Amino acid sequence: LHDDDFEHDHPELEIGSGAVLEDIEGLEMFTLKSVGIDIGSSTSHLVFSQLTLRREGASLSGRFRVTERKVLYRSGIMLTPYLSGTLIDIDRVKRFIEEAYKEAGFSPEDIDTGAVIITGEALKKENARPIVEYFAKYSGKFICAAAGHNHEALLAAYGCGAVDLSKAERKTVLNVDMGGGTTKFSLVENGVVTQTAAINVGARLIAFDDSGVVTRVEDAGRTLMQELGYTVEIGKKITKKRMEEFAAFMAKILFELVEREPSSSLAKRLMVTPPFANYRLSQVDHIVFSGGVSEHVYERDRTSYGDVGPMMGKSVRDYLKKLPKKRLLREPLEGIRATVIGAGEYTVQASGNTSYISNPKVLPVFGLKVIRASLGPGQSIIDALNRSL
């Protein structure tokens, strides 16, 4: 579950006649160390955070809310390594994560909670699930493995600050999270994420070396180039002109979704989730870009990393100027790290209720799914659970 409230402190609560409830560690408040690990189609990185949770209300059964978030360490950003077109180099990713733990001064035993996510085109690789499951077990005590385009969109909206912006200004914000393999969209209304969607468009669908020789091509990259009338092959050179055409074409498709529901057959084919329903740009007060390509949209980074990121950033800026609504663009709190911040800082809630476990040594249990059981009149809990499962 995500925590959808602002960072805030609760006032001291009076109980009875003049008694004041203090912040007692473990009773009224506690702190957790959290990790967010993002293994993406373009880049991989992680963030360690410290979360402070305080109890809501005077009752000991009141639930805890995250009231403070503090980033303790940000790793470097590594280009996700591949052994082939279908395999991520798990050994190199392991070394990178382990070195980041050492550099931060943490061991897995120090980490209380967090999430490991694998995103975009990386999610389609043959060894994607074993990688996520390995890091979920290696990284700390209670780490969840999260994946899925809608969930990633949600995390990015929280991590980049779009949700906080929407809530603070009571406005509708569109978050566009642009990665290497996919772009995620979140519509945030008055601080609530009301719709999410994703499309198979990203800056690293085609990767190339310093001389322009193609080193990797994703299926969506081939499809897009074919629409432009070009073929692309690993080991063959791609010209700068074709790179620019490719980047501009992807930006055009993205802005089809920014302005309305997808209308072209190509955009519909590239969707990896259902699109927004009953959506028009006229609803939106602000647009916030996040993800790796956002660093180029806001011109924070002009470096090419063997993909069309800088060209795509320029094309996005050009399309923004053509929109009928002006002054929509706002800056994110986090750009390339939006999803990993969301994973590390917005994936925890704590209940104030207690549960009895006869053998606590069985914990932690990994990979448990959350289900919603709807109870009808006179229906047994067992029947409701069986139906939900």
Task: Annotate each PLM feature.
Residues Y138-A153, G313-R337:
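Conserved phosphate-binding/catalytic loops in two-lobed NTP-binding clefts
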Residues S42, G181-T183:
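Conserved Rossmann-like nucleotide-cofactor binding loop
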Residues L1-I39, V47-A58, R63-N175, V188-M311, ...:
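Nucleotide/phosphate-binding catalytic cleft detector across ATP-hydrolyzing
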